[in-house]
Each structure stands twice: as structure tokens, then as C-alpha cells.
């Protein structure tokens, strides 16, 4: 144990005042008690800290009261992780400063953000080459900003909800369509500042603190003693996953916090890695006679993703295309669905391409050849190069979940307890066809209406079950659980990008087992002795 790189040493800091709103002061602030899951929570107090020091003060006060603490920011999550079960709701929405920029010796640019900074703000500022907060930056950051202006960089993680906050995306290891090429949030996080429930602060730099080969690591207590523990021993799924604490040999301890969903500590600041952006972007929509040909096309694209600059592969199945045609018939041009949607297509695949400008014609030619070779309809492909054209295709893609939501909203007028049942599951490459066949067989046998769409490049398809009545809803929920077990049996994850939150805690146990849950809770107790942080998230209350 002479090597202390596996010991984390949080420090006490001078705390700043952070008023807690209670009683009548909470009236009119009900929106903070819910997120996009539509679940409504309760809170004894609400705080809006403006600094790490204020966060430390707020959690110290909550701990003295014995209150649980729930973290919130943009409230874009759909698994109810930001929905409080009493106690203190800690909103980080005022932690909105981009604090600086630095360039490492190897030329990498790292952007220093507070947790409440929105993804949209980061991406827009990078496109503009300027940051509103730069007037307060130090000389090193200003020099790096001047160098940045000669580059074309971006931050790759792209969850569907672009108004998500940086801290929230890190807390659930967010991913999106472009995860196919660039991966999820985790590899782009270089440094974190984290407030623990005792008010002390951890600074975590990637590569600075690694667990031992057997998973052993420690955290220094306030009295100087070391509390020892082990990282989880379960195998991480061979797919994208946002289910539970990360596990890997000699785990970099920063990775415990990425994807921990606000249950180990409160992320207040982060340094995120920027990478070169493609010179030009293009969106392509391809149409297919049947699902088998669409799957063959997907497999071929996987083999050539780097060569062709394929950033995303998204699927829309036959049922979903039929739903979009009905939307077009009902709403016309306002539907966002083009009138030229092929009437006979049995599936569609959308691609995002990022490449060098002078390479784009050749890339599009190779794609057309590939579509023809696999049996698609090259003459019906849609290609969008200009920003406004790509935006129209984006609107078309988002018309599908909007249509699903409108159908559920209509059903809820008669059956208000019904909600959408949408899966968030991924399997390894070799099992894509298998899981699709299982989905269709089980859904047909249950006589449930559904559509399938999503990130086919990562074998991460969303099955959206559309229950017509309470009986359908129960059958759909039972199938949802059955699908989760099947996906785990195939080596996949039942929570690929949205996290576990408070809604899918049983799926986490399906994935890691009883022993895995015990190992995770042991890790949690090292950082949160009284288990007050994120109560009900990951682990059932």
C-alpha cells in the first residue's frame, strides 16, 4: 500500500452562504420538482448555489438536518433522477460560467465549465470562436482562446436533448446518435471537481488516481485515516451503457463519478476535451424494401465508418414510416414530414457524414454504390449538405418521437395513468438481428401496437410500445422486463443512454445481480456514509 495513487484526498474549503428556500418560499417553484420523466416529487428545501463553496455549504446544512439531497440542473432527464423524494433539492442551474480554456503540451484543448453550462452554449460558443465569460479569464486561457480561433473544434457528446447541462451529461455518461463514431461522454472528461456529502471537495484528474489491480482504493477521512474499498467486480456490458458505476481493471477513479447519476458526489466543475470537427457535414436518408436489407447496410457501414466518416446510423422501421405518413396526411407541411416519403419503403436509415470538403463527392458516390449493392433504392435517397437542408432532415427525424408522444397524450385523455413504454437497450453487434426478431415476435404475440427506431449503429434501438388501454399497458410493461433480461443474457445493457434513475432500478439488478448491487452500495458508502445523496436513484428506496 506504499503507492498512494489509489487514495483520494478530499479537502475542506471555505464555504459560502447558500440560502435554503423552505415553506411558503417554495410556492411557485413546483417545476423544479419534476424532470422530463413527468414524475413529480416533493422537497423540504430548495437551493440555488452559485459556486462550489455554496454547494458545500448547502450539503453541509442538509446533512445536519438529516435531509436527503437530490441534484438538479436542466431537468432534461427521462429516468426521474432529478425528482426529489423530500429533503433538499440542489439546483445547479446558476453554475453557468465557462471558467477558462487551456492547451496541453500535446496540443489538446480543454474547456473548463461549471456544471450548469448547457451543451448548446458550449457548441454555439465553439462555432463563434468566442465565450461571453472570457472577460474574466486568466492570461493562459485568453492565449489558448486565440489559438482556438485558428482551429475547428467541437465537443462530440450529443444527447438528443441539446439543452442538457454539462454536469448532468457527465453524471449519466450521456450519449446520442454520434456515439457511433465518437463514443459517449466518458472519454471526453479530463477533470472533475466534486463536492462530497460532508462538504469536502475532490479534484479528480484523469490518470492521477487508479485503483489497484484487485480494485482496491481508498478515501482519506476528515481525521486523516483511510477508508478502503474496492471498485465493482462485475463485467461492463460489451455495448454502450449508462447503467451503474463503471467497472474496469485498475479503474481510473474519475470514472466512478462519470455515470454515477449524482449518487456519489455533486459534480460542480469539469474540464472537457475538444476534438477537431469535420470540414463539412452531410445528412443522408436511405430507404429500404425490408428490414433485412437495412441490417446488411448497417453491417457494411460499420466496417467503413472511419473511411466514409459515418458519424451516426439511425433506423426507422416500417411501422414508424407508416405513422409518419399518417402524420403527413393529417397535418400536411406542418408535420415536418416530406410529401415525397416513399410509399413502399419497408424501413429507412439516416446517416450523418463528417468528412473533408473535397472528399464529400467521392464519399456520396461510394454510399450510392453501397446502397445499390445491398438492394436499396438509391434514386429515392435524400441528401442534405447545407445547414438549412440538414435542419429539415433533423425536423423530420424528430417528428417521429413527437408523433409517439401525441398518440400517448390522446390515449391519456381516456386512461390518464398510461405512459409511453420506450426501451433504452443495446446489444453487441452480433446480436442485432436476433434482438429485433425477438422484439417483433413477442410484440406480435401480445397484439401490441409499436414502432422501432433509434441508434442502429450501436444496436441501440428504441422499441416504443403504444398501449391503447390499461390491459395493453400491463402487457407492455411485462414485455419490457422480459426484453431487459433477454438483452442482458445477450451481453447487452438494459439502460444504454438514459441512465437508471428512479424508474429502472430493477433493471440494474437484472444487469449486475445482487452481488453487483452490494458492491455498488459499498462504494457509495465510502463517499456518502449516511446514504443521503440521490436517494431512490440506482437503488430502490
Language-model-detected regions and their locations in the chain:
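N-terminal flexible segment immediately upstream of the FAD-binding catalytic core
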Residues: 1-64, 76-110, 119, 124-134, ...
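General beta-strand structural signal in soluble alpha/beta enzymes
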Residues: 20-25, 47-49, 68-73, 80, ...
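C-terminal substrate-recognition/cap domain of FAD-linked oxidoreductases
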Residues: 26, 30, 258-477, 486, ...
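A glycine- and small-aliphatic-rich helix-loop capping segment at beta-alpha/alpha-beta transitions
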Residues: 83-96, 127-131, 176-186, 273-276, ...
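FAD-binding subdomain of flavoenzyme oxidoreductases
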Residues: 99-101, 115, 119-120, 124-128, ...
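Alpha-helix capping/hinge segments and adjacent helical runs
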Residues: 490-500, 529-533
Amino acid at each position: 500500500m506504499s503507492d498512494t495513487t489509489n487514495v483520494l484526498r478530499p479537502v475542506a474549503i471555505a464555504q459560502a452562504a447558500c440560502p435554503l428556500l423552505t415553506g411558503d418560499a417554495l410556492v411557485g417553484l413546483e417545476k423544479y420538482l419534476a424532470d422530463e420523466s413527468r414524475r413529480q416529487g416533493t422537497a423540504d428545501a430548495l437551493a440555488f448555489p452559485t459556486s462550489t463553496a455554496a454547494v458545500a455549504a448547502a450539503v453541509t446544512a442538509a446533512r445536519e438536518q438529516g435531509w436527503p439531497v437530490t441534484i438538479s440542473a436542466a431537468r432534461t432527464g427521462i429516468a426521474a433522477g432529478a425528482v426529489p423524494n423530500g429533503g433538499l433539492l440542489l439546483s445547479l442551474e446558476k453554475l453557468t460560467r465557462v471558467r477558462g480554456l487551456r492547451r496541453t503540451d500535446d496540443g489538446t484543448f480543454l474547456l473548463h465549465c461549471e456544471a450548469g453550462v448547457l451543451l448548446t452554449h458550449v457548441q454555439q460558443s465553439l462555432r463563434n470562436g468566442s465565450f461571453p465569460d472570457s472577460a474574466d479569464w486568466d492570461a493562459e486561457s485568453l492565449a489558448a482562446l486565440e489559438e482556438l480561433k485558428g482551429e475547428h473544434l467541437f465537443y462530440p457528446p450529443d444527447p438528443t436533448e441539446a439543452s442538457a447541462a454539462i454536469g448532468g451529461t457527465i453524471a449519466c455518461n450521456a450519449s446520442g446518435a454520434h456515439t457511433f463514431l465518437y463514443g459517449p461522454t466518458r472519454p471526453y472528461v479530463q477533470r472533475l471537481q466534486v463536492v462530497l456529502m460532508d462538504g469536502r471537495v475532490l479534484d479528480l484528474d484523469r490518470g492521477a488516481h487508479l485503483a489497484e489491480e484487485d480494485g482496491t482504493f481508498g478515501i482519506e477521512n476528515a481525521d486523516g485515516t483511510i477508508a478502503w474499498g474496492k471498485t465493482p467486480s462485475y463485467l461492463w456490458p460489451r455495448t454502450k451503457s449508462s447503467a451503474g458505476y463503471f467497472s474496469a481493471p485498475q479503474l481510473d477513479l474519475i470514472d466512478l463519478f462519470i455515470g454515477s447519476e449524482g449518487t456519489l458526489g455533486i459534480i460542480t466543475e469539469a474540464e472537457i476535451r475538444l476534438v477537431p470537427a469535420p470540414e463539412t457535414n452531410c445528412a443522408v436518408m436511405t430507404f429500404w424494401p425490408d428490414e433485412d436489407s437495412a441490417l446488411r447496410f448497417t453491417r457494411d457501414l460499420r466496417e467503413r465508418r472511419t473511411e466514409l466518416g459515418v458519424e451516426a446510423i439511425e433506423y426507422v422501421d416500417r411501422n414508424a414510416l407508416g405513422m409518419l405518413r399518417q402524420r403527413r396526411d393529417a397535418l400536411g407541411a406542418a408535420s415536418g414530414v416530406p410529401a415525397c416519403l416513399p410509399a413502399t419503403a419497408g424501413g429507412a436509415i439516416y446517416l450523418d457524414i463528417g468528412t473533408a470538403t473535397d472528399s464529400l463527392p467521392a464519399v456520396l458516390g461510394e454510399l450510392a454504390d453501397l446502397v445499390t449493392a445491398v438492394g436499396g433504392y438509391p434514386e429515392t435517397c435524400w441528401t442534405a449538405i447545407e445547414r438549412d437542408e440538414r435542419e429539415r432532415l433533423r425536423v423530420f427525424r424528430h417528428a417521429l418521437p413527437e408523433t409517439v408522444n401525441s398518440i400517448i397524450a390522446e390515449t391519456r385523455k381516456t386512461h390518464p395513468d398510461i405512459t409511453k413504454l420506450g426501451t433504452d437497450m443495446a446489444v453487441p453487434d452480433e446480436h442485432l438481428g436476433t434482438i429485433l426478431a425477438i422484439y417483433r415476435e413477442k410484440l406480435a404475440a401480445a397484439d401490441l401496437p409499436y414502432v422501432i427506431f433509434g441508434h442502429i449503429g450501436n444496436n441501440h434501438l428504441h422499441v416504443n410500445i403504444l398501449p391503447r388501454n390499461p390491459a395493453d399497458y400491463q402487457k407492455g410493461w411485462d414485455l419490457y422486463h422480459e426484453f431487459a433480461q433477454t438483452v442482458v443474457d445477450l451481453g447487452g445493457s438494459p439502460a444504454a443512454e438514459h441512465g437508471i434513475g428512479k424508474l429502472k432500478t430493477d433493471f440494474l439488478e437484472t444487469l449486475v445481480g445482487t452481488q453487483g448491487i452490494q458492491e455498488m452500495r459499498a462504494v457509495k458508502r465510502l463517499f456518502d456514509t449516511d446514504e443521503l445523496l440521490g436517494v431512490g436513484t440506482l437503488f430502490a428506496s
